[in-house]
Amino acid sequence: MQTAEIELKFPIHDLAGLQSRLPGLGFQLGTPRTFEQNTLYDTPSRTLRAVKQILRIRHYGDLWIVTHKRPADPAADGDPARSGDRLSSSDAAGYSAAASYKVRIETETLLDDGPALAAIFHQLGFEPVFRYEKFRTEWSHATPTIDGPLFTNPALPAELPIGRHLVLDETPIGDYAELEGPPAWIDRTLARLGVDPATCLTDSYGSLFLDWKQRTGSPVDNLTFDEIPTTASLLPRFP
């Protein structure tokens, strides 16, 4: 399925407190806290990174999911200055955008056998370049259609569906929330949650990982609980 992905992240300092408020704001729990493993693939010459695309296999609970993401504006492909990427020697870099909202076209589908697809990727010349893990809790919001146009960027296909979701991610380097939906709904939800828009981010987890490495001097290569042990990794992986 292909969808328009419009989202913002913000750091969470009180995960339990935030979750306790969500039902009163019209959110419904979609998926309880579930362990998630992600692997990004690219060619040895980083062909996908050069055009701001990602190819990912995700293991989410019992599910395997393959995802491709690309910029909503083809003119931004391959232009680090426009996309806001900070390229470096790390394979985690180059998979983020910087704007008021992060806007991507996402195509994904469920898999029966993730390792089999990984083997196919290998035969086609794609190799694992970055791994990241988190515990994710998914909430959805049933909002009446009062937001007006979902998005006015002519580069974004108008026929693509846009949901309204909030996900809570517990990563080895901190907790983050992602709001995904029409910009008007995102802005209204941030206000209802009391989140300062100045604290919001469009960085990918790869970029957040690089920032963390620069601050800490850590030599690790992946954003995983094995490489960055935290108390979160000691909690049950499935509720």
Short names for language-model regions:
Residues 108, 178-180:
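Active-site scaffold segments
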Residues 59-61, 172, 183:
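A generic beta-sheet turn/junction motif
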Residues 83, 87, 192-194:
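Edge beta-strand at a domain terminus
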Residues 166-173, 180:
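A contiguous pocket-lining binding segment that forms or flanks enzyme active sites
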Residues 12-15, 182-186:
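Helix N-cap motif at beta-to-alpha junctions
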Residues 1-80, 87-163, 199-239:
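N-terminal strand-loop-strand beta-hairpin
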Residues 184, 190-201:
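A hydrophobic, small-residue-rich beta->alpha segment in the mid-to-C-terminal subdomain
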Residues 5-7, 173-176:
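Phosphate/nucleotide-binding catalytic core
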